[in-house]
Amino acid sequence: MRKMLADGGISGVEVASCGTKYYGDLEREEVMCRIAAEHGYEMGGKAVTMTEELLNSADIIIVMTEYQHDEVTRLLTYSHWDRIVRFNEYCFGEPTDLPDPHYQTEHVYRTCFDTIERGCREIVRKLGA
């Protein structure tokens, strides 16, 4: 997302990614990093834990699944719940979950990556409009 924003000449947007199931430092999965690198994206670092402070400071919170939506509402101040959107709905107008590829086949990762890449392009388009 950061690379797409920079390539699109869009500044002033802060991007953060965090997990809803992980606490503490967790290395990113090798297959995910490899697929991203094949497409010119850097996925270094460790997974970031979702925190109340991080969520409440966000203008928009894009989740992949309804489960993640529910997890976010547990930490997010009620008055900010309108900031939560599901990825497929925000990007494509489809009220569906984006399946979690973690610990599945490489094919599932690649399919998920393609959807995320298309969706991120749509987000950049919306921000640049």
Region spans (language model):
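Phosphate-binding/catalytic loops
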Residues: 60, 66-129
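Conserved active-site segments centered on acidic
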Residues: 1-58, 125-129
